[in-house]
Amino acid sequence: MKVSLPAFEKARVLVVGDVMLDRYWVGPTGRISPEAPVPVVKINQVEDRPGGAANVALNIATLGGQVQLAGLVGQDDTAHALTLGVQTLGVEPQWLTIADKPTITKLRVLSRNQQLIRLDFEEAFDKADSVRLLKQSEALLDSVDVVVLSDYAKGAIDQPRDFIALARAKGVMVLVDPKGSDFGRYQGASLITPNMSEFEAVVGTVTSEADLLEKARGLLKQHHFDAILVTRSEKGMTLVTANAPELHIPTVAREVYDVTGAGDTVISALATSLAAGADLPQACAIANTAAGVVVGKLGTSTVSRIELIEALALHHGESGFGVVSEDQLAYALEQAKLRGERVVMTNGCFDILHAGHVSYLKQAKALGDRLIVAVNDDASVKRLKGDGRPVNQVDRRMAVLAGLASVDWVVPFSEDTPQRIITRLLPNLLVKGGDYKLEDIAGGAEVIAAGGQVQVLGFEDGISTTAIIQNIMANQ
């Protein structure tokens, strides 16, 4: 499967669920306590990280999505620390404060990268608190495309059926990270993401691949889910939908260091991808890759777009390349330059790709390590070439270009010239075909001012899109 990142900045997501603070006390240990047979840890580092549903929201924000976070907190210093933690990364908290309950806190003591003990500070929230939270969250549905219910069985999400039904009626997808043995609580959800233990707690022991699929499809029918994504640790993920063959995605983790928050990463990457316009198989592949990154980190962690681009390139070869948005390309270009790669850029309409184009692009690629092709969108081609053009729509033109071995990235632009996009990207070498003077090439002055170069390459004589069109018309 070819995997490319959607424009995450377009994603609008609401996360509702059990928010908590993950607190870490870290230090060396060199002796056993005289009071009891336990190690003595000399704490020299204290760190607070948003956890649970808050970690889901942070993952979405780190990927570039717009996210609101609804949850239950106490009237305490921990709630203040949690608020600061999420606001720092642009998450908009929508707390419901319960004065007589503490904000959930999980304190972990670590030494030499090993967790020695975990201490939980929490009290169960009342069912009435959950009802109030979900009712408060209904007002946010009109401003989002996807809702994530992040359930840690702490009381924030007790009976969400009515909330799910309302969201679906408004055209909002609902993704659920489930907890407990009653998946019927989430009836009507678009997608649920149980891990294997959670799945077997509901359906019983899975004895084979066929058994897994049969039981998953049974849940789809019973609870009116659109899809189930079962996360299976070292076996990857299995996506089961009602009307399509199952999809198995193998794990991409290189080294498992800490699985804390891996489920949060999966559902956050799914939500961000789907809200940004990715289809479900693509979103699952992106989520699988994100999970492979996060398990290589210590503690509750997030995955950035840069890390995801690098991981996709590593595990999928062409992933992270091909047809990309301008923002995706800016990130990829930054990483290419950090790796010391020489980036070449050219542009054009490329309406009917012909041998002259192929030869020209091959020459351009030979001048560096990576080649960007910026393509005029349909409206700008029509303005430049007149009625009847383009012959091929921009998505088809870009797909053909992306299939060439010489081309690494293809990006559209809407202006009559590529001046703006070239000025933003600033390649090492800007190439143009034809008989242009260097000073007349759009973006050339800016590239040179930034330390880059501009070069003109020749086209093959007698081959042009216009000539091809005229020949076709003459032979009709």
Curated annotation (Swiss-Prot):
EC class name: transferase
CDD domains: RfaE_like
Biological process, per Gene Ontology: ADP-L-glycero-beta-D-manno-heptose biosynthetic process
Renumbered residue ranges of the record's region Cytidylyltransferase: 345-476
Residues the record marks as active site: 264
Superkingdom classification of source: Bacteria
Reaction it catalyzes: D-glycero-beta-D-manno-heptose 7-phosphate + ATP = D-glycero-beta-D-manno-heptose 1,7-bisphosphate + ADP + H(+); D-glycero-beta-D-manno-heptose 1-phosphate + ATP + H(+) = ADP-D-glycero-beta-D-manno-heptose + diphosphate
Keyword field contains ATP-binding: yes
Transmembrane residue ranges: none
Any one Gene Ontology molecular-function term assigned to this protein's record: ATP binding
UniProt key word Nucleotidyltransferase: yes
Gene3D superfamilies attached to this UniProt entry: 3.40.1190.20, HUPs
Pathway assigned in UniProt: Nucleotide-sugar biosynthesis; ADP-L-glycero-beta-D-manno-heptose biosynthesis; ADP-L-glycero-beta-D-manno-heptose from D-glycero-beta-D-manno-heptose 7-phosphate: step 1/4; Nucleotide-sugar biosynthesis; ADP-L-glycero-beta-D-manno-heptose biosynthesis; ADP-L-glycero-beta-D-manno-heptose from D-glycero-beta-D-manno-heptose 7-phosphate: step 3/4
Oligomer status and interactors: Homodimer.
Main function: Catalyzes the ADP transfer from ATP to D-glycero-beta-D-manno-heptose 1-phosphate, yielding ADP-D-glycero-beta-D-manno-heptose.
PANTHER family attached to this UniProt entry: BIFUNCTIONAL PROTEIN HLDE (PTHR46969:SF1)
Protein family membership: In the N-terminal section; belongs to the carbohydrate kinase PfkB family.
Protein known as: Bifunctional protein HldE
Protein species of origin: Shewanella baltica (strain OS195)
